[in-house]
UniProtKB/Swiss-Prot annotation:
Protein name from the UniProt record: Large ribosomal subunit protein uL23
NCBIfam families tied to this protein: PRK14548.1, uL23_arch
Similarity section: Belongs to the universal ribosomal protein uL23 family.
Biological function: Binds to 23S rRNA. One of the proteins that surrounds the polypeptide exit tunnel on the outside of the ribosome.
Organism name: Thermococcus onnurineus (strain NA1)
One matching Pfam family: Ribosomal_L23
A GO term, aspect molecular function: structural constituent of ribosome
Keyword Ribonucleoprotein listed: yes
Keyword S-adenosyl-L-methionine found: no
Organism phylogeny: Archaea, Methanobacteriati, Methanobacteriota, Thermococci, Thermococcales
GO cellular component: ribonucleoprotein complex; ribosome
Summary of subunit composition and partner proteins: Part of the 50S ribosomal subunit. Contacts protein L29.
Keywords associated with the record: Ribonucleoprotein, Ribosomal protein, RNA-binding, rRNA-binding
Gene3D superfamilies tied to this protein: 3.30.70.330
Length: 86
């Protein structure tokens, strides 16, 4: 899948911001058909980082949410600032 079609939007909630600061994780709403590998490739291509792991879930609204943990040498805070979350 095209990286720009996989990631729909970032999630900006208290929990998501806490995860950026404490756990080096970014949270996105993604295409429901995207696999964890698709999400990993999309984040790595769009933000020029390395991804350690991806956790996904389907929300009550029927959207797919992805928690993307970055490798320790990359900062989720810097990426969040670059995409305008802070």
């Amino acid at each position: 899948m095209d990286p720009y079609k996989v990631i729909i939007r970032p999630v900006v909630t208290e929990k998501a911001v806490a995860m950026i600061e404490n756990e080096n994780k970014l949270t996105f709403i993604v295409d429901r058909r995207a696999t964890k590998q698709d999400i990993k490739r999309a984040v790595e291509a769009m933000f020029d980082v390395k991804v350690e792991k991806v956790n996904t879930l389907i929300t009550m609204r029927g959207e797919k949410k992805a928690y993307v943990k970055l490798k320790p040498e990359y900062s989720a805070s810097e990426i969040a600032a670059r995409i305008g979350l802070f």
